[in-house]
Amino acid sequence: MADKPIKEEKPRSVDPTVLELMPECTEQAIGTAWDRLKKQSPQCGFGQKGVCCRICAMGPCRLDPVKEKLKYGVCGVDCDTVAARNFVRMIAAGAAAHSDHGRGVAETFLATAKGEAPGYEIKDEQKLLQVALDLGIEIGDRSVQDLAIEVGEKCLGMFGEQTGPIPFLKRAPLKRQAIWKEHNMEPRGVDREVVEIMHRTHMGVDQDPVNLMQQGSRCALADGWGGSMIATELQDIIFGTPQPILGRCNLGVLKKDEVNIIVHGHEPTLSEMINVVAQDPEMIKKAKEKGAKGINLGGMCCSANEILMRHGVPNVGNFLQQELALATGAVDVMTVDVQCIMDALPKIAACYHTKFISTNYRAKMSGAIHIQFEEHDAVNIAKQIVQAAIDNFPNRGNVHIPDISCDLIAGFSHETINYLLGGMFRASYKPLNDNIINGRIRGIAGVVGCNNPKTTHDSDHLALVKELIANDVIVLQTGCSAIACAKEGLMLPEAAAKHAGKGLAEVCETVGIPPVLHMGACVDNSRILMAATAVVKQGGLGDDISDLPAAGAAPEWMSEKAISIGQYFVASGVYTVFGTTFPTMGAPGFTDLLFNKYEKIVGGKWDFEPDVSVMARKMIEHIDNKRAALGIDKAKERVLYDMAMRRELDG
């Protein structure tokens, strides 16, 4: 039996499906993340503030810069070095998670190119050519297969490269590349940067917070411009580059009269194949023989975002809804791969009829059925999982599915935005730049990240995004933050008229887009990097990402991946603010480095703001300051261009 719930006064969520299912959890004596957090409270203040050191067996040491007896650890280390070590170790873990995802995709990609992965194929040949060019590969009249093999080998090579720099850095603006080179931040190989952090943070090695952060930046950049970018680009080539697509989201997408399968995790190699198999007429026939009307596939967390933006597969919910999905009693199989999968899930599944299936050797779980996924036998493994769900359908007990879901438009890849703005034959970011310059759009914000039970579920995402779009800031989203806003209806074109400021609403209506754009899963933050780079290269808004009227935020973060993402945005020149908690607040010197001094080095900086209204104000103020620096802070007279004037502009 799972943990028993306890009374909670603070609102757990603003999502009505969550609130509706809480009594179900209480009745079944199923504790959730909220219950377990309450039992853990009060949490260790030293750990929360980043000043607990467990690196050697002379400790653990708890440091406090104010109390004389706690100023130094046993080895003499101070709080700033401890916080820096802990922080860059979080970067290493986050970068390793995203980059190992990228490695797995590269391996599947290469197997596909060699014809060794039945069921997978090269779907976007145009993007294959573009990636090959960016990797410095000669195209000539080579076959698609030959080109794909070299792309796969070159991407896999980025992980073990020893000298660097990694090739995708050349995609960044030239000024940004020069900054990285000047400060010795160019990643060599993805794996090398993670290993070097672990060496530097061993007892008695790197004891300089500035030097530690130099390596932290290099490792984070190896994630954003390396491992994550590899994952995004190669997934687009073999699964298809996302285009605008209609979908539905929230727990109400589960169906009482159909076999329900949830794919949860991050790597789309498995979920793509389950999506294919779930539509197989033979499998649907088998489901009907068991009394179901069909097979309903849904996604959770970033697996949801992956298959939503390519196929319109319903999105069941974000991070803090994974336990509640099982509490509906309607899930016949939940299959998981890696990352953000709560340890409690097998215990909760055991309270119902649900079969909980793990599929990745990196992520086995006690109480789970393990079916190892292999790309060379993907179809048969997917059939095995779908068959398990079909066979389990008759075993259901009571079912309680909240009748709440919402439409959304997903699929806004960097390429799609390009075409939407400029047209199929003249794809360009110029209309976006023009509308930023003329003030209709105030700026750009990336709002991304997780959920955290320390704050009311989804509330900070929604409050921040609504405030930003009301002030004419267009919002780009990934991950669980994207799901939060999708459930609120903010990813529909009509949301612009309801929530956006006059200028942004006008642009959204003209182009036919929502004011909040779904750009994918957490690895797809690399799409936001590419979009920012495209804006710079289009011209008129400076010559570096740090010049843009843009900001980033993760208001409800909880994962080490979020720290790596935040650092690669900061190191790329973006002001980045996190909410809820921040893991360096017990080290004033190191925090000052991140929040202030670091901007002089890389043009971007960190910030922490638990009050989401203040967070929005800080982001808008930063955007306004960047507009002023560009000289576009004052509205300009509108000019109606005749054809001759337009030709002159085009020339």
Where are the regions that the model predicts?
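Anaerobic metallocofactor- and corrinoid-dependent redox/one-carbon enzyme cores
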Residues: A2-G651
